[in-house]
């Protein structure tokens, strides 16, 4: 388990699937992520079994440190040990957004990526209309690295994707502040 002051990250478990399906099927927020909605428990179980065998991915449940309540999920995908990079993802249940918990979870997973996996670069993309996510990742130290035009199809139209990245050296400087 990776522990912080307010949140901890533990390996994603099968009993986390039911909460995950509810969160992913929330139309209000689900349209901001690049996936087909709705999803089913069966589909999420299949995802869980596949990702648990995938050597290029790590998935975590985000839990409150004080009582271990499951409040979200995060992870790394497309881990490339040769080039020492990976793609990060995160989502929190609505009631926990805006409390600094997501930032703490991102910090924990970046520590894991840079200090345990010895990766050098972590990246992600955000739909250009998701302004709160853009602000969030910038506050976490990610840098805007460019735009892929019409990269994602959402709500019956194409949206641009903004790519963000953070290097180990940048993260190490942020930790000293």
Stretches found by the model and what they are:
Residues 1-46, 170-177:
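A short, well-structured alpha-helix characteristic of acyl/acetyltransferase catalytic modules
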Residues 12, 123-126, 143-159:
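Conserved catalytic-core motifs of GNAT/GCN5-like acyltransferases
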Residues 39-97, 167-171:
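Acetyl-CoA-dependent GNAT
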Residues 68-72, 132, 158:
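Glycine-rich acetyl-CoA-binding "A-motif" of GNAT/NAT acetyltransferases
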Residues 92, 98-112, 134-139:
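Conserved acetyl-CoA-binding loop-helix of GNAT-fold acetyltransferases
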Residues 102, 106, 129-133, 150-155:
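Short glycine/proline-centered loop/turn elements that form peptide/ligand docking sites
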Residues 137, 142, 164:
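Conserved active-site tyrosine of GNAT-family acetyltransferases
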Residues 157-177:
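Terminal substrate-recognition subdomain of acyl/acetyltransferases
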